[in-house]
Regions:
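Helix-loop boundary and gating motifs at the non-cytosolic
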Residues: 2-61, 211
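Paired small-residue
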Residues: 19-20, 104-113
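C-terminal ends and interior cores of transmembrane alpha-helices
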Residues: 85-101
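Cytoplasmic helix-loop-helix junction between adjacent transmembrane helices
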Residues: 109-151
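Helix-to-loop junctions at the C-terminal end of transmembrane segments
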Residues: 62-76, 164
Length: 211
């Protein structure tokens, strides 16, 4: 199995987009726990912390399908302004926590950050499907990405907790690392044009439906 992974990672551009895709996915396992711990520490309210985490996830769930359809039509670089908006909103959340802004500010920033983040894992898998030729290779690639997801969900929360609960560091340090990983990983990933799947464009049915 290991040799199969090595073989697909040797494909032109494969290792680079897989690695940057992993970095870009780290925030998905760090943001919720980082927000919860930071907000509870500064606002002394698990209720507000839970609300902010819930708003982030709900906003993501509501917009991810729409963003995915637009990526199919216009290509993966369509996500760049949305990723930038998500990062800026996360910075806004960090500033709001630091200066004890009104809870509404936290909720607004959380909604924007979650609603514009999109699914980086889906973009990585789309590149594998475009790059590889055989079903066996694609199956191996998807198995690799599933393992990458597990790495993110194991390492991310541990890293976030260590950062937030380390007294010399600010309580927002978990969010700072998460937004840095999102910005660097996502933009580096999306800048790799050679492995980007071609945009499908609008079909006649989509034009008529106004999608």
């Amino acid at each position: 199995m290991a040799s199969n992974y090595v073989n697909i990672l040797r494909k032109p551009g494969a290792f680079k987009f897989s690695a940057t895709g992993l970095l870009a996915r780290m925030p998905m396992s760090m943001v919720s726990i980082s927000s919860l711990l930071a907000i509870q520490s500064e606002y002394h309210s698990y209720t507000l912390a839970g609300q902010v985490s819930a708003v982030t996830l709900i906003a993501f769930a509501c917009t991810a399908p729409w963003l995915a359809r637009r990526v199919d039509i216009y290509g993966q670089r369509f996500m760049i302004p949305f990723i930038m908006a998500s990062c800026l909103a996360m910075v806004g959340e960090i500033v709001s926590i630091t200066f004890h802004a009104h809870p509404v500010a936290l909720l607004v920033c959380a909604a924007i950050a979650g609603g514009t983040s999109g699914s980086m894992g889906a973009l990585v898998r789309a590149r594998w499907s475009n790059l590889l030729q055989t079903p066996d290779e694609i199956h191996t690639a998807f198995a690799l990405e599933a393992a990458m997801d597990e790495v993110a969900f194991i390492v991310g929360p541990i890293l976030a907790t260590m950062l937030v609960t380390n007294p010399p560091l600010p309580v927002t340090s978990g969010l700072i690392v998460a937004v840095t990983a999102q910005a660097v990983g996502s933009l580096w990933f999306l800048s790799q044009r050679a492995t980007e799947p071609p945009a499908k464009g609008r079909t006649a049915a989509q034009e008529q439906a106004g999608q």
